[in-house]
């Protein structure tokens, strides 16, 4: 078992896993995820494979249509996590243990700086080394000093940070979900239209109410921003939280995040002889802008002389344009105004707001993991330096002081530092 863990702790094995994960993520970025089988049959046909091999059968066989949720991708993440844990225990911890040990020696090997000097100022040299931030220990006539032990400990936290990120990714793949809802103003809804989910996903039964929806426009009638005011409703029907969301400003409640994504117009509410009725609209586009069309009948459908007016809506400002049967603009009507002979009154635009709801149980692991990763990566670049001093007593009260030093980084800086400490103490 120990041999297996040593193989897992091998750097080449970890790099190979990282390479496989990177290639897999690349495929996940190129191939559209969580689409229907017909979509892949249409875009990845057997007759003209992309790259000479990528067809819908290959995608379906290797589950490339939902890469981040399939078993072999999660297995790669788990393998990398186990490799990092093994590396931490078999390589990092022994190195830390060695670094914390007081390693006294008269002649250490492979040093970056070495000098001998006759001086009566050995005490001053030791004090100077301590003032440079070294922790100095004494054993009889030998001294040992270390500096930057955090640089040896930080790689352990780098590994732990990556493990946190991997755990967060696995939790998100297994238990997260994504839902798209189109909800009318004033309606209460539950999460239903789930577009993607993991095998261990548990859908929330949280009730949400859309209190209002509105749009801000630029002076040229281009949409500036659209907003939805949402309320979180508890089991007793009481509002526990409310917030106005917009694009890039979501509502976060417990493990749910509500994003503003889209909007649409469903119809118009018209009043006729003190009775309200609704007429649907058809959406089309004109110069890449949304336009809605509808037809308002002015007489009964059973009448032989059926007449009506065509209505066009091109924004959500509350204005409609009425055209006659010849396609000529008849009039422009605002909300609460009459359309025809004071019998038909425009009451309301019937709109829906697009809300994307996401649940990611691993998001905290990922955030903390990246936070620790940034800090620990910076700390891991700190040099770990060691200094050895050996004292030999000579005749006439003279002292021969042997100074050795080495570091794992910034070797030139260490050599310069030791030279400055010793040059005036001869």
UniProtKB/Swiss-Prot annotation:
Pfam families xrefs: ResB (PF05140)
Domain of life of the native organism: Eukaryota
Cell compartment(s), UniProt: Plastid, Chloroplast thylakoid membrane
The keyword Electron transport appears for this protein: no
Lipid bilayer topology: Multi-pass membrane protein
Main subcellular location: plastid
TM region positions: 11-31, 70-90, 153-173
InterPro entries xrefs: Cyt_c_bgen_Ccs1/CcsB/ResB (IPR023494), ResB-like_domain (IPR007816)
Keyword terms: Chloroplast, Cytochrome c-type biogenesis, Membrane, Plastid, Thylakoid, Transmembrane, Transmembrane helix
GO BP, one annotated term: cytochrome complex assembly
A single cellular component GO annotation: chloroplast thylakoid membrane
Function: Required during biogenesis of c-type cytochromes (cytochrome c6 and cytochrome f) at the step of heme attachment.
Family according to the record: Belongs to the Ccs1/CcsB family.
Self-association state and partner proteins as the record states: May interact with CcsA.
PANTHER family (UniProt xref): CYTOCHROME C BIOGENESIS PROTEIN CCS1, CHLOROPLASTIC
Name this protein carries in UniProt: Cytochrome c biogenesis protein Ccs1
Species in which this protein is naturally found: Heterosigma akashiwo (strain CCMP452 / OLISTH)
């Amino acid at each position: 078992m120990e041999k297996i863990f040593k193989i897992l702790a091998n750097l080449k094995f970890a790099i190979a896993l990282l390479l496989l994960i990177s290639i897999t993520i690349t495929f996940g970025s190129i191939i559209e995820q969580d689409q229907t089988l017909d979509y892949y049959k249409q875009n990845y046909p057997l007759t003209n494979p992309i790259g000479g091999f990528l067809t819908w059968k290959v995608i379906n066989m290797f589950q490339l249509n939902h890469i981040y949720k399939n078993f072999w991708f999660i297995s790669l993440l788990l393998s990398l996590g186990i490799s990092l844990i093994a590396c931490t225990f078999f390589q990092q911890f022994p190195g830390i243990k060695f670094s914390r040990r007081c390693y006294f020696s008269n002649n250490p090997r492979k040093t970056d700086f070495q000098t001998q000097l006759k001086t009566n100022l050995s005490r001053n040299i030791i004090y100077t080394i301590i003032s440079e931030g070294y922790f100095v220990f004494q054993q009889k006539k030998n001294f040992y000093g270390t500096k930057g032990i955090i640089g040896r400990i930080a790689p352990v936290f780098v590994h732990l940070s990556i493990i946190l990120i991997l755990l967060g990714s696995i939790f998100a793949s297994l238990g997260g979900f994504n839902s798209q809802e189109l909800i009318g103003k004033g309606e209460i809804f539950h999460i239903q239209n789930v577009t993607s989910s993991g095998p261990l996903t548990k859908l929330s039964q949280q009730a949400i109410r859309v209190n209002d929806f509105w749009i801000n426009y630029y002076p040229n009638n281009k949409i500036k921003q659209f907003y939805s005011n949402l309320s979180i409703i508890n089991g007793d029907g009481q509002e526990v939280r409310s917030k106005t969301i917009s694009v890039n400003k979501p509502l976060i409640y417990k493990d749910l995040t509500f994003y503003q994504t889209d909007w649409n117009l469903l119809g118009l509410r018209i009043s006729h002889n003190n009775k309200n009725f609704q007429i649907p609209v058809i959406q089309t586009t004109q110069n890449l802008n949304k336009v809605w069309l509808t037809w308002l009948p002015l007489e009964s459908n059973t009448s032989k002389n059926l007449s009506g007016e065509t209505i066009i809506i091109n924004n959500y400002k509350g204005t409609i344009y009425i055209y006659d049967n010849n396609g000529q603009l008849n009039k422009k009507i605002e909300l609460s105004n009459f359309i025809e002979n004071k019998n038909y009154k425009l009451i309301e635009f019937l709109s829906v707001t697009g809300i994307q709801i996401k649940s990611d149980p691993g998001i905290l692991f990922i955030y903390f993991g990246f936070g620790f990763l940034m800090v620990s990566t910076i700390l891991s670049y700190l040099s770990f330096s060691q200094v050895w001093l050996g004292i030999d007593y000579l005749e006439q009260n003279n002292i021969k002081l042997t100074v050795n030093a080495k570091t794992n980084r910034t070797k030139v800086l260490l050599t310069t530092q030791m030279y400055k400490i010793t040059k005036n103490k001869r």
